[in-house]
Amino acid sequence: MIVLAAAMSLLVACDDAPREAAKPSAEGKPTLSDVPPPLVPAMPLPDNAVDNAVAKLDSIADDLMKKSGVPGLAVAVVHGGKTVYARGFGVKDIRAGDAANNRVDADTVFQLASVSKSISSTVVAHQVGVNAVGWDTPVVEKLPWFALSDPAVTKMVSIGDLFSHRSGLPDHAGDMLEDLGYDRRYVLDRLRDQPLDPFRISYAYTNFGLTSAAEAVAVGAGKPWDVLADDVLLKPLGMTSTSYRFGDFGARSDRAVGHIHVDGKYEPLYTRDPDPEAPAGGVSSSVNDMTHWLAMVLANGTYAGKQIADPKALLPAITPQIVSSPASEPAMRSGFYGFGFNVGTSSAARTELSHSGAFELGAGTNFVILPSADVAIIALTNATPSGVPEALTAQFADLVQFGEVREDWYQLYNKLLAPLEKPVGSLVGQKPPANPAPSAPRSSYVGTYHNDYWGPARVSEKDGNLHLELGAKLAVPLINWSGNVFTYEWVSENSPPGSIGKATFDGNKLTLEYYDEDGRGTFTR
């Protein structure tokens, strides 16, 4: 069996060039292929597949803009090492109308949100290739202060574990601390308070888990993450409009302003500063810049004749490391996650690399790479995620592989993403009681209520009204609902418009419902 396994491995590895399924001979008989079976897709590409698909992108983009109402969109395609399409649609900021300098073009800079994870993965791949770290390097070797709730996991958890979301940390652990304005180190320190699922066999998507791994790589390099990324990836690729620093994004004149979806309209109401989780969600870039990165990934780590990432270090990132979307029936294909990349198999039996990015406050992004077709596409929007970039790239991938669009992708993705806009809180949709119970004197609620995880909550009184402060960002009036129950409204990345916070006082205790999902929402005076 060992000999057989070795032979099969050799068969798979003997030729890694993109190949097509054999086409029938002139006599109509099938032509047998000598390409290793794992490299053969289920069907050949249509003639002129990429050119024909590119020719339809303008109409696809226009249609999706009309259906969704998103303010701005930019799209680019790389094929054969060249940019074959790059164009913008719509506007950067709806307040400025259709002025020429407000129109989106291929150089307009967007926030990429979680597409940043894939870019960060290639930064790490560079470092792995020069033997600065390994995907299997334990994080505590570089960050001695880092800890999770299980000492054994703390000792073993590696850079690769955190880049593949298999550390056992809960889904989006730490994100709500970021919403409150805490800095990166504070959030990473609090990861030790999180309960863990089984190590290396559980998948749960975490921004700050990945960020901790990136921080370890940066410390190992002796420079901040944003500087490391500049030095080993962005500058060598000539990505002059790309940065991990939110300040750089804000300083650019040609930037797309984020728009949030409120009451059926998109409005530029909020600013999303992702610096605390920059390796996971902080990149800003244009589609023209992103074509350089896509070309590098398609070329197995090389760009313009220069090796950016060692192919052996890049390969683990773009191949499955854990099942992220298990099949629900035998005939279904499972989805996988590599190191910072979604990895799957299309219905044409082609490997597909992808990632989406989503900021509720105003960014929706996606890229798709089909290595066997030597093509990649990226789509960026400046609006609450609605499925537009995913639908556009999926339609393009269908056209490349089949010559036609085979699903109503916008309907599928729009339905999938709709829950992101759902307000949170048990009092949402309820009317205040007609005859509320009287509350205690306002002064009796005043004070500082302590919580080891969320930090101190400060309740103050001004002109007979109560105010709540928590972290650096939450500062809201408290409105009496009934008795010792008060409410507040606050919009953040994880608290969409219409959400209602519930604050319940009980002597020297204050329970904030929004922060109590896992039982940690009680503060003590």
Feature locations, PLM:
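Short, small/polar residue-rich loop motifs at catalytic or cofactor-binding pockets
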Residues: 69-72, 361-364, 453
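C-terminal motif of bacterial Sec signal peptides marking the signal peptidase cleavage site
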Residues: 10-13
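Short, well-ordered beta-strand elements
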Residues: 365-382, 511-513
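Short, conserved catalytic-motif segment at the N-terminal edge
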Residues: 47-110, 129-134, 141, 149, ...
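Bacterial N-terminal signal peptides that target proteins for export
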Residues: 1-2
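Short, surface-exposed loop or secondary-structure junction motifs
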Residues: 89-93, 151-361, 365-366
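Bacterial lipoprotein signal-peptidase II cleavage site
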Residues: 15-22
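Peripheral terminal and inter-domain segments
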Residues: 15, 394-525
